[in-house]
Amino acid sequence: MNKKYIIFGATGATGSALVHQLYEEKKACHLIAKNKDELENLSSTYGYSYSICNVLNLNFVDQLVKDLNSIEILGIAYCVGSIDIKPFKSTQAKDFISSYVLNVVSVTEIIKAFQENLKRNNGSVVLFSTVAAKRGFVNHSIISSAKAAIEGLTVSLAAELAPNIRINCIAPSLTKSKISNFLFDNKKNIDVIQNMHPLKRLGEGKDIASLAKFLLSPENSWITGQIIGVDGGRSSVA
């Protein structure tokens, strides 16, 4: 039977690390991202099937249903994200709407579309929040509000979709990635950011992916509705 894990945002730091870790464990995956060249390269490296998709276009679900029609879905990891940092006075309504669609609305459409598939496979869904959803950081109003909504969605769907579908959420702190590189443009910035974390280093995609892999595994089938920090200690002991 064609059983696979579906990885959204597969070409990003966390997504690509998760793909690698699942490959190491000989798990089959279907990769989804919007950058055609990067996605084709990743697919070629691991021999996985893929779909090119921009989740900001809500019509994407219809095509995905066709692409994944023959796949039995063991789990979904929604490793899609953004870094929307600006002073509140500079924000516009479209900033909040775009972030909410990317982080919340799109994943609700995905879960609805594949709910029955996940249910018959006792599947797992892993979502992603941020440490900033619970801690107040300057200039984070856009992303904090969208990710706080993801945390609410996690616990609500965990209750509603039990016992056959597990929903959990990972809340990282700042992680090294293509979209965060602008924050690490000099050593002083790096040192300042590292020192905000008790473990005194920046997070990496593999740090987050390790927990995502754990939560996707059917061996951990008594965990649902959890928001778990992978943040170098920043949320609780910084």
Regions found by a protein language model. Give the residues of each.
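Residue(s) in the substrate-gating loop at a strand-loop-helix junction
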Residues: 130
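Catalytic Tyr-X3-Lys loop
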Residues: 82, 89-109, 126, 143, ...
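Alpha-helical segment proximal to the catalytic Tyr-Lys
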Residues: 116, 158-163
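Active-site loop-to-helix junction immediately N-terminal to the catalytic Tyr of the SDR YXXXK motif
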Residues: 136-144, 156
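A conserved structural motif in NAD(P)-dependent oxidoreductases
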Residues: 197-208
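N-terminal Rossmann NAD(P)H-binding glycine-rich loop of SDR-like oxidoreductase domains
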Residues: 11, 19
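Short C-terminal tail/terminal secondary-structure segment
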Residues: 135, 213, 224-238
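Short, small/polar-rich loop/turn modules that mediate ligand/substrate recognition or access, typified
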Residues: 162-166, 223-225
